[in-house]
A protein has these predicted regions:
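Boundary at the C-terminal end of the N-terminal hydrophobic targeting segment
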Residues: 49, 59-61
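Substrate-binding cleft/loops of secretory-pathway carbohydrate-active enzymes
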Residues: 158-160, 229-249, 330-349
Length: 563
């Protein structure tokens, strides 16, 4: 007999009257209804019990949805820090409360690996607080994760669903494979330790894959965080991580957190959105241009550059997803400060910071609360921890800043194909010469965002890239056959509308992805106007109000031409 395990979010719960929902909740319930999933269907096909969904059987939990599913997109953040990170500030209750207030359905606490976290009981104490946070926030999916220091490279989110070994997995992984704890930090091309460190990162991902395969944990996922911030995640490393565990290492942050870090007059004259204020170092990969070290419309250069690193990986015909998150440590203009240590205490010997205390003065910080500005939307057919992870693995993901739109549904199909077609992360198999059509349904913002404005989408770009298979040069970061092929001017359009865009005949395998913005700041892309005529551009240092430059991106849909 299945048992109730997870109450639904208020906007999805039929027991919650529509009149009690805020505008965001009403909009999301409308999207749920339009997908035909409002009610028992969204709860895994079982009955409700007081607003709680009933646990699917193990077989149901592993059964993938069809290639043409009705999807609802859950809003989340996989990069959140609490007092269990040495450089953060907030308690679990503060962060979960903010996430609920700003409309998140799921979140991952990702504490930094650290001596105190790994060896002074921080991880175990953190797990007890995770359990309490779940009990106090029953309508939210709260994962325990880790921000892994990749040997010889940057950071990654690592997380698994609730289970008997969720905390133990992270502790074992941290102690055996963390680059910071092991001293495996060198990554420069000429450093003698670099080959060992890069190999250890691959072994780490393979170990996680094995824990999933043997059933030690039900699932585990890894995503690279702020990949170009320091220029130390080389293209060959990112490909090696992907190939080491394709179902585990699934993507990267397309846009970093710290998006509030460059408000004019706040963080200093050299500040950049995302805190991308670095220069190449001895550990940086020398093939990246200087322009790679700043953000573009808040997005990492690897994602924002049409024909750049993300496209070069997609052009191999392999899915590699993007996300966007808060990376919250210290919220801009917030008045809380770190509490004082008791005599003899420090992070290394107790594994956490003192609880913060409120003041009357704004404290330093460059972040937003989870869900306040950055959102990762994951397509699911029902509500649950493993469903979110399955949606991420399948690539059913789109991201936005500033609540730019309420929803987007992307379908690629033959011109006269049956059904609605393949959606984000999926693959459409066609014969050479078949005509392809792209259908995009946009639901515009129906309410004020968290800056007090109703966002307006100005344009939607279709980006197309040829698929050529594996690259000969594992450090190749260009995809020369990728470019913007269509721009839809949607200025002034409101409500829900569908764009039907003919793509032409499929002569070779390719992929499509979408990008849109509020239209306030754009210019020729990094690789030229012929490839990207109006892409995101960097802001002047110290003058990066994020609410005045908001974008949305989707994951790709692949079209595989068979002969």
């Amino acid at each position: 007999m299945p048992r109730p395990i997870q109450p639904l979010p208020r906007w999805a719960d039929p027991d919650v009257p529509a009149g009690s929902l805020d505008p965001q909740g009403l909009s999301r319930r409308g999207l749920l209804r339009s997908a035909g999933l409002f009610g028992a269907t969204f709860a895994g096909g079982a009955a409700f019990a007081g607003g709680a969904l009933l646990a699917p059987t193990p077989a149901e939990a592993h059964t993938p949805a069809s290639g043409d599913p009705n999807l609802v997109y859950l809003v989340g953040d996989h990069h959140v820090h609490s007092v269990y990170s040495h450089d953060a500030k907030y308690t679990f209750s503060q962060l979960a409360g903010a996430a609920s207030r700003y409309g998140l359905d799921w979140m991952v606490f990702t504490e930094h690996s650290n001596i105190g976290h790994a060896r002074a009981g921080g991880a175990e104490a953190e797990h007890r607080e995770i359990l309490k946070a779940r009990a106090d926030n029953k309508r939210m999916l709260i994962f325990q994760g880790l921000e892994w220091y990749i040997p010889g490279a940057e950071h990654c989110t690592v997380f698994s669903p609730p289970g008997r070994h969720e905390a133990e997995l992270l502790t074992r992984f941290e102690q055996a494979y963390d680059g910071k704890l092991l001293g495996y930090t060198a990554g420069g091309p000429d450093h003698p330790d670099t080959p060992r460190n890069e190999a250890h990162a691959v072994k780490a991902l393979q170990w996680l894959d094995q824990q999933r395969r043997c059933g030690y944990v039900d699932d585990v996922l890894v995503l690279a965080n702020h990949p170009l911030r320091l220029g130390i995640d080389s293209p060959h490393e990112m490909r090696a991580w992907r190939d080491a565990a394709p179902g585990i290492m699934i993507g990267m942050e397309g846009a970093p957190g710290a998006q509030a870090g460059a408000f004019p007059g706040w963080a200093g004259p050299n500040s950049i959105r995302g805190e991308y204020v670095n220069k190449p170092s001895e550990n940086s990969w020398p093939g990246y241009p200087a322009a790679a070290y700043v953000t573009y419309g808040g997005f990492d250069w690897a994602t924002a550059t049409v024909g750049g690193l993300w496209d070069a990986m997609l052009a191999e015909g392999r899915l590699f997803s993007i996300t966007t998150n808060s990376d919250v440590h210290r919220v801009a203009y917030d008045t809380w400060k770190n509490g004082d240590w008791l005599p003899g205490q420090n992070f290394d010997n107790i594994g956490r910071l003192p609880d913060p205390v409120n003041t009357a003065e704004p404290q330093p910080g460059g972040d937003f609360w989870p869900g306040q500005f950055s959102r990762t939307h994951v397509g699911v057919t029902r509500y649950g921890y493993r469903d979110v992870m399955a949606g991420l693995r399948a690539g059913r993901v789109w991201v936005d800043h500033g609540q730019l739109i309420d929803g987007i549904d992307v379908r690629v199909n033959r011109e006269h194909g049956i059904g609605r077609g393949v959606t984000l992360g999926g693959r459409l198999r066609v014969r050479r010469g078949e005509k392809i059509v792209l259908n995009v349904t946009v639901t515009t913002a129906s309410r004020h965002n968290h800056h007090g404005e109703v966002p307006r989408l100005a344009h939607l770009d279709v980006i197309r890239g040829a698929v050529h298979g594996p690259v000969a040069d594992r450090d190749e970061w260009r995809a020369p056959d990728t470019r913007v092929v269509h721009t839809a001017d949607v200025e002034g359009r409101a409500g829900r509308y569908t764009l039907r865009i003919p793509v032409g005949k499929a002569e070779e395998s390719f992929y499509l992805r979408l990008r849109g913005s509020d239209g306030k700041r754009n210019g020729p892309g990094f690789l030229g106007a012929a490839i990207d005529p109006h892409g995101p551009i960097p802001h002047e240092p110290g003058n990066g109000d994020p609410w005045l430059d908001t974008w949305c991106y989707t994951n790709p849909v692949f079209v595989d031409v068979v002969h």
